[in-house]
A protein has these predicted regions:
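Flexible, compositionally biased loop and terminal segments
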Residues: 1-243
Length: 243
């Protein structure tokens, strides 16, 4: 797909910790699985809204390495939902110019899901409107540790080269904003390297409730902030003291 739009790495990179599916369902007397199903609908809404709001890369935290400790039935349901999403959304992603990448370990995923991931990535490889990264069996600390092990064999190393080892791709824009839903205020091992200078936005909204308006609110908050990346803002010179 060819396009003359702004290159994706010149647009915002937003990461979202999609939290609150289970609590959303419990408050409504529904099963936790129903909450995860509603969470998939929220993904569709935000993937559609993101390019319209200046986002070029969207990284969604779907399943952490620690989530394997959840009840087996819930994990199985999550894997089924992932496979369903991959199988049913690919045509829509291709149509809308979305390139899908799944980050995290794949060796522990069911074989059918690993194959579905590879197929979806191939099918959407030419998308140039939005880069959608879904983190599955993901740990930022593990990603950094694995990158360090690979870097040990190199004779020289730059920050850019190490970043490529961590993220698995060259030229990925650092994360500008990390959003977490459900009112929790922690990063939970998400994008620790590429989000080193990311702004943080926490909302009480549960992920199944999150919509384009909530995304716009998070981006408006981000735009009001002054990002100094460790430096100082320009301050007026103080007058010299009188002698």
């Amino acid at each position: 797909m060819q396009s003359d739009v702004t290159p994706l790495n010149n647009k915002l990179h937003v990461g979202i910790i999609m939290d609150g599916n289970g609590r959303w369902a419990t408050r409504r007397g529904l099963s936790r699985v129903r909450g995860h199903e509603a969470g998939v609908e929220a993904i569709r809404r935000i993937v559609e809204a993101a390019p319209k709001q200046g986002i070029g890369t969207l990284t969604l935290y779907a399943f952490s390495t620690d989530n394997w400790r959840r009840p087996k039935a819930e994990v199985a349901a999550l894997m089924t939902l992932l496979r369903f999403y991959l199988g049913n959304e690919v045509q829509s992603l291709v149509k809308n110019g979305v390139r899908l990448t799944v980050i995290g370990r794949r060796d522990r995923l069911p074989q059918g899901i690993a194959a579905a991931i590879a197929g979806a990535e191939r099918a959407t490889a030419h998308g140039d409107v939005l880069h959608l990264r879904i983190a599955v069996d993901y740990s930022a600390r593990d990603a950094i540790l694995n990158a360090a092990a690979k870097a040990a064999a190199l004779t020289s190393l730059t920050r850019e080269a190490f970043s490529q080892l961590v993220t698995g791709e060259a030229g990925l824009r650092d994360v500008d904003l990390i959003v977490r839903t459900s009112g929790e205020k922690r990063l939970s091992d998400f994008l620790l390297w590429e989000g080193a200078y990311a702004e943080l936005h926490f909302t009480e909204r549960m992920w199944p409730e999150f919509d384009a308006g909530d995304l716009a609110e998070a981006l408006a908050s981000f735009q009001r902030r002054e990002r100094r990346f460790g430096g100082l803002q320009s301050l007026p010179l103080e007058p010299a003291p009188s002698l």
